[in-house]
């Protein structure tokens, strides 16, 4: 069984940092991983409805096959998908950027809990230096 399903962004700048973060948590080979541009935003947006379907199908398989206990949602700062989909650059105002990511991370958490109330959901925001903060 896997402990969790991780949703992260496709940004090439952070792939190694994501792996290092998960390894640092002692989760090497303990999680399934789905990658969508924009992470939480990608799973929710109407910009590409196929991404919504893909996320939910992956979550179902992770739950049914690997009996995951939690979903880890990891957005990151200076996300190009947020710029493209929302047509705004929030990276210049860190507080606003945190609020915007927080909104989509919360919205996805609520949607997950509606379908899978038994799953724990973590909401994280990665900085470009690879450090991670929890988002409330």
Regions found by a protein language model. Give the residues of each.
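Divalent-metal-activated hydrolytic enzyme cores
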Residues: 1-18, 37-53, 61-70, 80-136
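Short, ordered loop/turn segments at secondary-structure junctions
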Residues: 76-78
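Short Gly/aromatic-enriched secondary-structure transition segments
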Residues: 19-26
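A short beta-strand-loop structural module common to alpha/beta enzyme folds
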Residues: 29-39
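A generic structural signal for alpha->beta connector loops
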Residues: 27-30, 118-120
């Amino acid at each position: 069984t896997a402990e969790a399903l991780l949703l992260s962004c496709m940004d090439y700048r952070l792939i190694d940092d994501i792996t290092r973060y998960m390894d640092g948590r002692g989760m090497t080979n303990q999680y399934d991983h789905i990658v969508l541009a924009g992470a939480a935003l990608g799973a929710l947006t109407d910009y590409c409805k196929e991404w919504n379907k893909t996320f939910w199908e992956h979550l179902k398989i992770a739950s049914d096959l690997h009996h995951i206990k939690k979903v880890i949602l990891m957005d990151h700062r200076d996300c190009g998908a947020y710029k493209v989909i929302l047509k705004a650059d929030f990276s210049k105002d860190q507080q606003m950027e945190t609020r915007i990511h927080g909104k989509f991370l919360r919205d996805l958490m609520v949607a997950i809990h509606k379908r899978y109330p038994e799953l724990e959901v973590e909401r994280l925001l990665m900085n470009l230096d690879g450090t991670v903060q929890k988002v409330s």
